[in-house]
Amino acid sequence: VRAEATAKALRTYLRRTFHALECCEVQISRRQRGLAPVNALVTQRAGRMRAVPSFPSRTGLKGASIASGAMFRGLAELVGLDAHDVQKVRDVQADFAARLSLAGELLPRYDFIHVHTKAPDQAAHSKDCRAKREVIEALDRALEAHMPMLSQDPSILTVVASDHSTPSSGPMIHSGEPVPVIM
């Protein structure tokens, strides 16, 4: 019953918002430029925070995360991983290299380290496939430069994966294609 009341209130609010946004200056300007309307609020991921068992307590593994983006940092902390950061730089290769170097320094203290970059996702959202290719190539160069460090210990498993597909063209933001995984 409470969920139904919440859904009804949210639906009412979203309808009001839709109509209010139709008349705003930004919307009128977007229409004049032939751009898609901005006429809704994103309500995904809404909910209450609840207790989550820590990753170390569930698996016995001590982990760290070196991620770009506050959401990944918060998620790491939520599940009991140590969140580390590097000084952000605009150069994709240098940024990823700094993350990998920090991972190398941290390896003796952790069972696994999650290194994340949003760079390919951000490039894909620009809908410029050349930009996405350049970002992936920059990440490859950074990874190649760090392979001696990552391959010196046979017990180290390096996994490269994508969290989701982001088309470089068309209207979709994310899509459902399979993503590559390299081990």
Task: Please report, for each region that a protein language model flagged, where it lies by residue.
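Feature captures the catalytic ectodomains and active-site-proximal regions of enzymes
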Residues: 1-183
